[in-house]
């Protein structure tokens, strides 16, 4: 049985690649059980649906930090639907020049947190500069009311990453309907394809 440890999405040449780390209970020739830690890295970009979902979540993650601009903070009275689902954040110049190069999802058999790494392009004396940043570890706490829309979307995407990664590690290529069926099986409840 595979136990999820960490999923890392790295951006190279505007494409996202996945690296997954798992632990598993293995059996040696003498039939003794032991814990084995191992990882697998893809050499193919992640699929389009997952890539699009990840791109849409970046502003939500950045909005949950104070690194891009000190005025970016979670606000309980915020209209999340309007700001994120209607892509109003595209007009927010505080996100201009923000590039996330890596997202690391951590946990203990479940996705519990995420941390972002990247840079913001700024111009000084007529020349562009990359100012590197990394966010704090962002806990995926479904019960924090002011973070609920953010967390629900993150968890949904992380579940997709886990399902796709497990099957990819087994050498399978899945359709969207097959991914939905696997998610339904793991969650024990129907999931729309």
Which stretches of residues belong to each language-model region?
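OB-fold ssDNA-binding interfaces and closely related basic DNA-contact patches used
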Residues: 1-111
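Secondary-structure junction/capping motif
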Residues: 52, 175, 192-193
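Conserved binding-pocket/active-site segment within a compact domain
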Residues: 94-186
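Polybasic, proline/glycine-rich intrinsically disordered low-complexity segments
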Residues: 185-193
């Amino acid at each position: 049985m595979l136990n999820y440890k960490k999923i890392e999405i790295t951006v190279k040449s505007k494409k996202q690649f996945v690296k997954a780390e798992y632990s598993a209970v293995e059996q040696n020739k003498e039939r003794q059980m032991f814990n084995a830690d191992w990882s697998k890295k893809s050499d193919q970009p992640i699929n389009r649906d997952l890539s699009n979902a990840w791109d849409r979540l970046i502003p939500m993650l950045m909005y949950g930090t104070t690194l891009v601009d000190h005025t970016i903070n979670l606000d309980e009275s915020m209209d999340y639907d309007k700001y994120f689902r209607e892509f109003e954040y595209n007009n927010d110049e505080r996100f201009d020049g923000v590039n996330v190069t890596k997202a690391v999802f951590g946990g203990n058999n479940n996705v519990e947190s995420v941390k972002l790494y990247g840079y913001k392009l700024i111009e000084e004396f007529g020349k562009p500069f990359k100012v590197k940043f990394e966010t704090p570890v962002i806990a995926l706490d479904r019960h924090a009311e002011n973070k609920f829309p953010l967390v629900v979307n993150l968890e949904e995407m992380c579940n997709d990453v886990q399902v796709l990664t497990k099957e990819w590690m087994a050498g399978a290529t899945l359709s969207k309907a097959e991914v939905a069926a696997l998610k339904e099986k793991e969650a024990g409840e129907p999931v729309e394809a």
